[in-house]
């Protein structure tokens, strides 16, 4: 919100809502917002397609999405070493989704749909490939453009370049986009 105020955007022209996103979007009227932002949320949803449907219903014009992809499963969490030997570019180009366990208690919030395993509270993250995301967009009748981060990308890389703690520490913030670990879209409703 500070950014919007700093940029002198009229407070009556935006609204930030902090609550369960699914419950909120299910009860609002269709086409309630010109633009719906979805940054860092989609992968925490047990059913990401359901959230996409709700956002498409709520938006008049545009949905902006920034999310992790299936490649993220190869670099994040203690199970990552089990995943990355099996993740090839051929697999990551298929329309599929990988679900991985993650701690349900985060720094500032708790994830929904928690379950206990060996005394730890866990949730799942849902990590679709780009192909899966675009299949969903098409099924919802949306047109899209992938946002271009190339002007910020310092080097070509893949998730293989971001496996170790040392690689992550020395990486540039845009490496997650260059590697396909993260992707951004502008969806037209």
Regions found by a protein language model. Give the residues of each.
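S-adenosyl-L-methionine-dependent methyltransferase catalytic module, highlighting the catalytic core
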Residues: 46-58, 63-184, 188
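Local beta-strand N-terminus motif with an aromatic residue
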Residues: 14, 32-34, 60
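A short His-aromatic
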Residues: 40-44
